[in-house]
Amino acid sequence: MIKARLSLFSLLLFSASSFADSHQVYGTYLVQEKNSHVQITDCGDGSPCGVVVWLDPTKLQPGITPDTARSKAGKPVLGLTMLEGFSRQRDDWRDGTIYHPGKDKTYASKLKRLPNGNLEVKGCISIFCQTQIWTEVVQNTE
């Protein structure tokens, strides 16, 4: 009986701790402006990289499609790497960069998975940071 309770307690503890793991940032997210999806995967070295995988056509300028949308620097936005260079810290990912295609600017960045599954994304210039909450996109499997 005690063994069964300990096993159940261990299972619940493991499940809860893995769900709330702030390092599990991989997935697809709707950015705060609700105009694009960024897919975060492993860069190949264990750190996260984020690539633009969808643009909302209703939020683009007239005559521009997701396939023809360009950054201020003239790069195609679809497929653009906008998050990279992160290192794992105790509670989050830090020392990375986030690229803003509309401004052609790159900022210092931090990433952290929130307990509700959303992603906290910070972009910083020196000590001044702006925080956004990106919503996890649930893929329809039907």
Q: Model segments located where?
A:
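Short, solvent-exposed mixed-charge patches
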Residues: 140-142
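N-terminal helix-cap/turn-to-beta initiation motif at the start of protein domains
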Residues: 19-28
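Central antiparallel beta-sheet cores of small beta-barrel/beta-sandwich binding domains
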Residues: 26, 32-102, 106-107, 135
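N-terminal signal peptide c-region/cleavage motif recognized by signal peptidases
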Residues: 15-17
